Swiss-Prot record:
Keyword Kinase found: no
GO molecular function: DNA-binding transcription factor activity, RNA polymerase II-specific; sequence-specific DNA binding
Gene name for this UniProt entry: ATHB-54
Tissue-specific expression: Predominantly expressed in flowers and siliques.
PANTHER family: HOMEOBOX-LEUCINE ZIPPER PROTEIN, HOMEOBOX-LEUCINE ZIPPER PROTEIN ATHB-54
Residue span of region Disordered: 175-198
Entry's family note: Belongs to the HD-ZIP homeobox family. Class I subfamily.
CDD domains (alphabetical): homeodomain
Transmembrane segments: none
Name of this protein: Homeobox-leucine zipper protein ATHB-54
Pfam families: HALZ (PF02183), Homeodomain (PF00046)
Length: 227
């Protein structure tokens, strides 16, 4: 009877301990203990309490364990960096060789290379972006310089066109004046020749006077003779 009471007290004590600490270390995260094998798991004792948030807590615990496993020593990091610089891709044989050499799990080596490639690509993109920005700035500066030079040349061309137009106008006016001058000289010469011929004809308009030695002068008028 005394042994039966002692077993009952031990049973209830373990039950309370399981209920108080089930949120820290769920039974599904550990192998079954001798107590759970003898008395049953905490989920069998109190299913509602044991299953509450058990999956989340178990996942958190396993993530902490994985994080601890991923923590690498400086020597391991240096060797992994050297291997990454040699070859960015991780082949299966190389993964197993590195894991054995560094004392790591192959999955740890694979995850490290995956993260390292992601960081490498990010830095490469940043470098390419900076290079493109620098190239754009240089092209923009060159374009601004060429634009100013183009405007200057355009102004010079416009000025030369204006001067050429003025020169053409002057030449046209000179040719026109020369042409008009030649026409005026020709008309004057024709008029002079016509006047001389007309005077000779008028000299003999009155032959009876010509016999007496008088000749017709068309320039004579009554006012000239004061008649």
């Amino acid at each position: 009877m005394e042994n039966s009471d002692t077993d009952s007290e031990v049973f209830f004590w373990f039950q309370n301990q399981n209920q108080n600490h089930s949120h820290k270390f769920p039974s599904s995260c550990f192998p079954p203990s001798s107590h759970s094998a003898f008395y049953g798991s905490s989920s069998m004792i109190n299913t509602e309490t044991a299953t509450m948030d058990e999956e989340d807590v178990c996942e958190s615990y396993m993530m902490r364990e994985i994080t601890k496993k991923r923590k690498l020593t400086p020597i391991q990091l240096r060797l992994l960096e050297e291997s990454f610089e040699e070859e960015k891709r991780l082949e299966p044989d190389r993964k197993l060789w590195l894991a054995e050499k560094l004392g790591l799990q192959p999955s740890q080596v694979a995850v490290w290379f995956q993260n390292r490639r992601a960081r490498y690509k990010t830095k490469q993109l940043e470098h390419d972006c900076d290079s493109l920005k620098a190239s754009y700035a240089k092209l923009k500066t060159d374009w601004d310089i060429l634009f100013v030079q183009n405007q200057t040349l355009k102004s010079k061309v416009d000025l030369l066109k204006e001067k050429l137009k003025m020169q053409e106008n002057l030449e046209t006016q000179s040719i026109e004046r020369k042409r008009l001058g030649e026409e005026g000289s020709s008309v004057k010469s024709d008029n002079t020749q016509y006047s001389e011929e007309e005077g000779l004809e008028n000299q003999y308009s009155f032959p009876e006077l010509a016999v007496l030695g008088f000749y017709y002068d068309p320039t004579l008028t009554a006012s000239n003779l004061r008649l």
